[in-house]
A protein has these predicted regions:
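N-terminal cap/lid segment of alpha/beta-hydrolase-fold proteins
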Residues: 1-32
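Proline/glycine-enriched tight loop/beta-turn segments at coil->beta junctions
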Residues: 21-23, 30-39, 107, 245-246
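Cap/lid segment of the alpha/beta-hydrolase catalytic domain
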Residues: 30-103, 151-152, 157-159
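Mobile cap/lid helix-loop segments that gate and shape the active-site cleft of serine hydrolases
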Residues: 49-51, 204-241, 248
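Alpha/beta-hydrolase fold nucleophile elbow
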Residues: 106-118
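A catalytic-pocket lid/entrance helix-loop region that shapes and gates access to the active site
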Residues: 114, 121-190, 256-257
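Short beta-strand/loop motif that positions the catalytic acidic residue
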Residues: 246, 252-254
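Active-site-adjacent alpha-helix of alpha/beta-hydrolase-fold enzymes
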Residues: 262-271
Length: 271
């Protein structure tokens, strides 16, 4: 993507995390040499996709209005290195990314975050670590607890949501990462695509922990099955357990018929 009048675009910017893993980001920023507030989106859904650049916030309009917009692939997603374990790495990775931003000569020291669903989760999780430069978040349609209300419901594994989300959004769409980082052969990619087209057949596979499709490429799915109870694995990443540690302005956005409405209300009340 080329520069637009008044907007400078920089692609595939490497940002190293505390453990040496590199995450990649794109920047939309005003042309000039000033210092600007920064709006950050951290996504598992491909930072270069049109909806990442324009659904929650129009990146070009924001840059023309005097903001820097950074969109980053989460760990293990698309071009970013590492292995993707939903939620687990977003606390430190969010903190490290915000610290990196705050140290750039184009940042005025103020960072905000935006986006919904999993992208909303990355905001709450980053805020839990209290990076000094983070001043505000706008999490939309996301949960307060990733055990009850996301992965489990009343003690039952949310098979429909978990399987479809993992297979369609997190694995099949991540072709380049599967090939480069996991060495997945073409027939494996074809197998996953076929499964995504016939999900109803996959729902009937028993036992759940023996479902072979995600072995070695989406091990988080099996880790969720290993933690059916609300144990320390879940508590460490549960927003509602850490509201007292979140000291930034938060605009919570929900929908009355959204699956995460309960979590949206809990986060609002908890703050």
């Amino acid at each position: 993507m080329s520069d637009r009048p008044g907007v400078r675009f920089e692609s595939t910017i490497p940002i190293k995390m505390r453990d040496g893993i590199t995450l990649y980001s794109d920047l939309f920023m005003p042309k000039g040499n000033g210092k600007y507030p920064v709006l950050l989106e951290r996504t598992p859904y491909n930072r270069t996709a049109p909806f990442s650049r324009g659904l929650s916030l129009d990146s070009i309009t924001a840059a023309l209005s005097g903001y820097v917009v950074m969109i980053q692939d989460c760990r293990g997603r698309f071009e970013s290195e590492g292995e993707f374990h939903p939620f687990v790495n977003e606390i430190n990775d969010g903190h490290d990314t915000i610290e990196w931003i705050a140290n750039q000569d184009w940042c005025d020291g103020n960072v905000g975050m935006f986006g919904g669903s999993y992208v909303g989760a990355t905001q709450w999780l980053a805020a839990m670590s209290q990076p000094p430069a983070l001043k505000a978040i706008t999490p939309g349609i996301t949960a307060s607890n990733y055990h009850e209300g996301w992965t489990y419901q009343g003690g039952a594994f949310e098979l429909d949501f978990n399987l479809s989300w993992s297979l369609i959004h997190l694995v099949s769409a991540n072709y380049e990462n599967l090939v480069n980082n996991f060495g997945a052969p073409p027939d494996k990619i074809e197998e996953l695509t076929d499964m995504a087209d016939r999900l109803m057949d996959e729902y009937s596979h028993l036992s759940l922990k023996d479902w072979p499709a995600l072995k070695g490429i989406g091990d988080f799915y099996y880790r969720w099955l290993e933690h059916p109870e609300y144990d320390d694995y879940w508590k460490s990443i549960a927003i509602e357990e850490h509201h007292q540690n979140i000291d930034v302005a938060a605009l919570s956005i929900g929908g009355w018929f959204d699956i995460f409405m309960g979590g949206t209300i809990k986060n609002y009340v908890g703050m």
